[in-house]
Amino acid sequence: MKNLKFLILLLTFYSLQSGAQNLRVKIFSESQFNSLSTEAIHGNYQIHSPSGYIAEYKEGQSLHLQLNTSKKLHLTKNGEFLGLFDTLFILQSNHQDYLKIKPEGKVTIKPRQYEGDFEVTANQRGIQLLNLVFTESYLEGVLRSEAGTRCAKEYYKVQAIISRTFAKNNVDKHEKDGFFLCDAVHCQAYYGRYNGESKAINEGVKDTYGLVLVDSAGKSFPTFFSANCGGQSAETDQIWNVSLPNYVSRPDTFCIHTRQANWEQYIAKKEFLEYLSKNFFFDLNDEFLVYKALNFEQKQRKTFFIDPSLGIPLRDIRAAFNLRSTFFSCEPVGEKILLKGKGFGHGIGLCQEGAMEMVDQGKTYNEILKFYFKGSKLSTSAFPINHW
């Protein structure tokens, strides 16, 4: 409780100074590590513990944190030992300050750069690292991570609005874990700060400042996106077992000739059929069923493999064989099955490649949002200042 009160006091002070809100985002969330190094690339920082001030951390200096056998953070600055801690806060002096961070684990992890403040905590699984970052700075990082740096500004406007809305809708997704969002794709990919590679990213976020999507009643609209829907969007119950009335499957001709519109993957017949038998009691002695499995056709999106009565969700097959989408057909090729698929991702909501094509055809961000999010409208809505 003392840690939380101290953190809230610090964050309130910095939020009042800037007029913006900090999001608490777990970074490097898909990696486990027991040590990390940081370098202050731009600007100066202060290091605090829940007990108070520890040291200045100036531009060009480096920190190293190592989890010791007692699960304490062993902290050094430029090689000088500063103490053992359970929790540390690294606080920037100005909004533009940023660090380079490199976790050190069994698997090589590339360093990333981040703006904002940082909370470092020791636990039984290793080091947990949270980035306390202003919403609009976070969005710039999301756009860079989710869409790359080569899109047109009009597309970045679209992505900024739906990503801002998604963050608002999911700000309590990891509340029980002590943070708002993580940097994995199920929250939104966030692999570091926007570092000026594309002016259009900054302009796309700035030009849509505070804009979110709402429904006709003014309630926040659920926003989802994937790389390519394969020419037909999916319904939510086909993927997540949750039915949302605004998400009705419909054709999308904008993406059908783009880079990720089609894919192919071979799977051994024996492996595929044994998977069906083991997980869904599929009768391998039924020649007709086996034939249907090897020659499955999906001209329009379906929810189940072969027939709903068999209870084989396409999403389960996708997960088991790491397929690009659930939108595929099968044909036998020797001792293998050739899966010919369409799209990349779940196919719900915005089709990123379709939206990029719409921009190329001269459509505005508002027209694109209306096409992909039926029944939505734009509204200015801020996050609550004190979420917890």
Predicted regions and their residues:
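Conserved, single-site charged/polar hotspot
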Residues: 18-388
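Sec-dependent N-terminal signal peptides
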Residues: 4-14
